[in-house]
Structure formats: structure tokens, C-alpha cells
Swiss-Prot record:
Organism: Natronomonas pharaonis (strain ATCC 35678 / DSM 2160 / CIP 103997 / JCM 8858 / NBRC 14720 / NCIMB 2260 / Gabara) (Halobacterium pharaonis)
Pathway: Purine metabolism; GMP biosynthesis; GMP from XMP (L-Gln route): step 1/1
The name this protein goes by in its record: GMP synthase [glutamine-hydrolyzing] subunit A
InterPro entries, alphabetized: Class_I_gatase-like, GATASE, GMP_synth_GATase, GMP_synthase_A
Source species, domain of life: Archaea
Length: 184
């Protein structure tokens, strides 16, 4: 059975990420972001959202593990910042129901959502510049880089919250990540 850990970066929806994976039949565990990287035994990692970069614990070190990583909201931002991209204040801050345009139908994480999907966004900062090796896979009117992927390294990020009920195809994002982690 595929095992995916959800790293708690103190976000308000982290428990919903764990529940979404559990409901898909994934062997999942919610772990504290102070867990040493060498103690992680998993086929994949979800870096949860959270309030700010000052409370991300060992999350940057998890990017060095040789397993797929999905960053959600702050998780995507810390991935971009740690791997050489740039994060800054967004033009739109707060909560929003957003229509996201999928730019890469072949992307293993979100390509199946093409041509567009409705999502729930809740962020003040966003990725402004992609790290080397990443492609922008989704965009919207309120956020230029809504999703990014580096399929060579199995690193994926979404700025929105697929775990929230207001996101219309959120479960599909988790299904796709489960399949990536299982090698399907």
C-alpha cells in the first residue's frame, strides 16, 4: 500500500489533507515538521500550508529525500524558495473562489483537470519566479503561478487548497499524487 506523510506546517486545513488521503485508502500519517528527515519512511510527502516561513521546521530538508513531494500553498512557496525560485506578496490576498486554467494537460498532478477548474485560494504570498527545472502548469487572474511541476524530480506544487470542499476537483489532485507516489 502506498504510504504518504502529511507534514504539519501549522496550517488551518492540514487535517483535511490527511483526511483526503485516508479517504482514498492511502496509508497516511500526519507528522510534525520537526520530524528528522531520516525518520521519514514513506512513498511521498505532502508539505502542508501554514501561516508563514518562520514555522516550517525541517520542511526544506524533506525536499532532499528521493520521493515525490506535493507542496500545498505555503508548501509550494517553500519549495520554490528553497530550490531557487522567488516568493513575494501577491496582488490579491485573502480568501477566494478562483477559476484556474490548466496549462499542461500532460502534467501528472493536475493535467486531468484541464481545461480549467474552480478552486479555493487562501494566501497572501505566492511564487513569483519558478525554480530551475519547474514548469508553470496552471494560472489564474489572481495568481500567475497557480501550480508548478518538475516531473524529473517528482516535485509538484499547487497554490490553492485541494483539500477544501470548495475546490471542485480536489480529490482528483490527491488521487493523482497517490498514483505518482505508487509509480503508476
Amino acid at each position: 500500500m502506498t504510504r504518504i506523510v502529511v507534514v504539519d506546517n501549522h496550517g488551518q486545513f492540514t487535517h483535511l489533507e490527511h483526511r483526503a488521503l485516508r479517504d482514498l485508502g492511502v496509508d497516511t500519517e500526519l507528522i510534525d515538521n520537526d520530524t528528522p528527515p531520516e525518520e521519514i519512511d514513506a512513498d511521498g510527502i505532502v508539505l502542508s500550508g501554514g501561516p508563514d516561513m518562520d514555522r516550517i521546521g525541517h520542511s526544506p530538508a524533506y525536499l532532499d529525500l528521493d520521493i515525490p513531494v506535493l507542496g500545498i500553498c505555503l508548501g509550494m512557496q517553500l519549495m520554490a524558495a528553497e530550490l531557487g525560485g522567488r516568493v513575494g506578496a501577491g496582488d490579491y490576498g485573502g480568501y477566494a473562489d478562483v477559476t484556474v486554467s490548466i496549462e499542461d494537460e500532460s502534467d501528472p498532478l493536475i493535467g486531468s483537470l484541464a481545461p480549467e477548474t474552480r478552486v479555493w485560494a487562501s494566501h497572501a504570498d505566492e511564487v513569483k519566479e519558478l525554480p530551475d527545472g519547474f514548469e508553470r502548469t496552471a494560472t489564474s487572474e489572481v495568481c500567475n503561478i497557480e501550480a508548478m511541476s518538475d516531473t524529473d524530480r517528482n516535485r509538484y506544487g499547487v497554490q490553492w487548497h485541494p483539500e477544501v470542499a470548495h475546490t471542485e476537483a480536489g480529490e482528483e489532485v490527491f488521487e493523482n499524487f497517490r498514483d505518482i507516489c505508487a509509480g503508476d
